[in-house]
Regions:
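Glycine-rich loop(s) and the adjacent beta-strand/alpha-helix scaffold that form part
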Residues: 347-350, 354-419, 606-609
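Active-site- and interface-proximal helix/loop "cap" or "latch" segments in soluble metabolic
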Residues: 24-119
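Glycine-rich FAD pyrophosphate-binding loop
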Residues: 150-171
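Beta1/beta-strand and adjacent pyrophosphate-binding region of the FAD-binding site
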Residues: 122-140, 156
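Conserved redox-cofactor binding core of oxidoreductases
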Residues: 233-350, 370-371, 522-541
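Helix-rich C-terminal "cap"/substrate-channel and partner-interaction subdomain
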Residues: 83, 88, 463-547, 613, ...
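An anion/pyrophosphate-binding glycine-rich loop and adjacent beta-alpha core
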Residues: 201-213, 392, 396-400, 404-508
């Protein structure tokens, strides 16, 4: 009987063993400080496997930090590990995600070390055959891709980074465009700006292109004054502003091509659901010309984080376009003297070969290559940069290897309003909308809407080589951009000018005198101190706000030499067949200094031309 009981008990245990144990699921949440505020990660683990990860950070930069939140979460699930690679383009957000993920596992009662195995990517070599290959998925690259695809061409875009956008996604202002319907919604009040530009022409009496443009604009201005209908601007005035801003060394033909095609570019962008309808003032522009996006409340938003996700969506929804991310181009393939493809390296170290009938370089400049910057312009050694990590000048180097010529390589722009602690770009649009700059003594020191090189030089000459950008509540109420700066912790505030001075360590009495004087200048529409002609509204609505800014490397005006068809030229001035370039990888357009708003104009106009020309060549 005892033996039988034991046998039955054994059978029962065996039967119970056949029933799987209930899966154990635990969830934990952790938080860490990101770029714009708290980043929160929630991780769910079932039977020792990461089954769900959500990463949230409402104030992380759209198109940069927001992509890191998505990509790193997916990588953790795929690899069952929190030891995933940080995104070089979003290091602060990435590090916050990794720190918060570790805290989430601890909160779930788990050991983070058990989920920290490094997963090595494995991939085979790959070969593709397409009509057009584009290197770089920034604004120029995606514009070119969409344009070539419109012509029915198959396109591959190679992007070295894990996110699209390059420097374009970091653009904060808008797009300059001349003689547009959006401009005509404004009442013209920029007489002083136009006349100031015309009065400056004597400085450029030896520059034939500027002299001719000046004569044309003077005739246009006289005609407008005789019959002031609509808003005054013209292609030629945009050209003139661009040439003067570039100190007259610009390629006049390329400047004309850009300016003449901006209005059409604004219209074309609507096909990708991009609408730039708010028109404002920017440094170096005689009139209101910069076209900006607005949110659902009508408040201005940063142009890059608005445009680039829409461009990316348009590319991904186009059956003719393939995006290969984290794929770094190394070599331009040549056959019988013509470009015919790209050899690249994938994330896993595998070789990716793209055979194509035409090649477009849209890799951006080299503003993140601080060694290269210092070599070309030693006085910029030690400066911070606003540039995306991938802006290393690799496209220029690849093209030079096949005989391409470069131009203006030592023309490197610094931007005067870079947030002093993070190198985040503070939009020039705030100065165009009425903001002022004061130094450590609480005093203005320059026409704030002058060209970037002039404002930067004046700022560097101040105590500590920094300044404070001052705005008021009325400006904040109209701008989601300023609201974003507040959320990121960039902003100091005070209910009075005196209180703001105390908050930023500036003499309150001096700041109060400066602001009251400025508000009087705005009312009179006259700045006898520095000759500013763009005033907007007085800064007299409390509370008042200040952002500490300094100069940082922002744009490289030099690059590959191209013609009006975006064909890359060799060192003898001849076309390299099949090779095109657009965007910051090129040189000659902006001369010695780029005007704010012209980078987007550049990549839209020349991206479209490159896409159309490459598509035609591929026929």
């Amino acid at each position: 009987m005892k033996i039988r009981f034991i046998a039955l008990l054994t059978a029962l245990v065996m039967m119970l063993g056949m029933v799987p144990a209930m899966a154990e699921t635990v969830t934990g949440t952790g938080t860490a400080k990101g770029f714009g505020g708290d980043v929160t990660v929630t991780i769910t683990v079932t039977d020792g496997k990461i089954t769900a990860v959500t990463a949230e950070g409402a104030n992380e930069t759209q198109g940069i930090g927001s992509v890191a939140l998505e990509n790193l979460s997916a990588a953790m699930i795929a690899g069952n590990t929190i030891a995933v690679d940080a995104m070089a383009t979003a290091t602060i957000t990435s590090n916050a995600i990794l720190e918060a993920a570790k805290a989430a596992l601890v909160a779930a009662g788990l050991n983070p070390d058990d989920f920290s195995a490094k997963v090595e990517a494995v991939a085979e070599d790959a070969t593709y055959d397409v009509d057009v290959v584009i290197v770089g998925a920034g604004g120029a690259g995606m514009t070119a891709a969409l344009t070539a695809a419109e012509q029915g061409k198959t396109v591959i875009i190679l992007e070295s980074q894990p996110i699209v956008g390059g420097n374009s996604v970091r653009a904060t202002g808008g797009m300059n465009a001349a003689d547009t319907p959006a401009q005509d919604t404004n009442t013209f009040g920029e007489t002083a700006g136009v006349e100031k530009t015309l009065a400056s022409l004597s400085t450029y009496a030896d520059n034939e292109a500027i002299v001719k443009l000046g004569e044309t604009v003077k005739a246009q201005w006289d005609a407008y004054q005789a019959n002031p209908v609509g808003y005054f601007d013209s292609v030629e005035l945009m050209e003139l502003d661009t040439m003067i801003g570039g100190k007259g060394i610009n390629d006049a033909e390329l400047v004309h091509v850009m300016a003449a095609n901006t209005a059409a570019g604004i219209e074309w962008l609507t096909t990708a659901d991009i609408h730039l309808t708010n028109v404002g003032s920017f440094g170096g522009a005689s009139v209101k010309r910069i076209h900006r996006p607005v949110d659902g409340q009508g408040k201005t938003v940063s142009v890059g984080s608005y445009m680039i996700p829409r461009m990316e969506t348009a590319c991904k929804n186009n059956a003719n376009i393939t995006l290969l991310m984290e794929t770094t181009a190394n070599t331009i393939l040549m056959k019988d003297g013509a470009a015919c493809g790209i050899v690249a390296t994938g994330k896993a170290g595998n070789t990716v070969t793209v055979n194509a009938k035409a090649v477009i370089l849209a890799t951006g400049g080299f503003g993140a290559n601080l060694e290269m910057v210092a070599e070309l312009k030693p006085e910029l050694k030690g400066f911070m940069t606003t540039n995306a990590a991938g802006l290393q000048g690799q496209g220029i180097a690849m093209a030079e290897a096949v005989g391409a010529a470069t131009v203006d390589m030592n023309q490197i722009q610094i931007h005067p309003t870079v947030q002093a602690d993070t190198a985040a770009l503070i939009t020039e649009g705030l100065r165009g909308d009425g903001a002022v700059l004061v130094n450590a003594e609480g005093k203005r020191f320059i026409d704030e809407v002058g060209t970037r090189d002039v404002v930067s030089a004046a700022e560097i000459a101040q105590t500590g080589s920094y300044s404070w950008l001052i705005v008021d509540q009325a400006m904040l109420d109209k701008s989601s951009v300023i609201a974003g700066y507040v959320k990121k912790g960039f902003v100091f505030s005070g209910e009075t000018y005196e209180a703001l001075g105390a908050a930023i360590g500036v003499d309150g009495a001096a700041l109060t005198e400066t602001m009251n004087t400025w508000n009087g200048y705005v009312e009179a529409k006259n700045d006898p101190d520095f000759g500013r002609t763009s005033f907007a509204d007085p800064l007299n609505t409390a509370p008042y706000y200040a952002i500490k800014v300094t100069a940082g490397i922002h744009h490289t005006m030099g690059g590959l030499k191209i013609n009006a068809q975006t064909q890359v030229l060799n060192t003898e001035g001849n076309v390299i067949p099949g090779l095109y370039a657009a965007g910051e990888v090129t040189g000659g357009i902006h001369g010695a200094n780029r005007l704010g708003g012209n980078a987007v104009a550049d990549f839209v106009v020349f991206g479209r031309i490159a896409g159309a020309e490459a598509a035609a060549y591929a026929n």
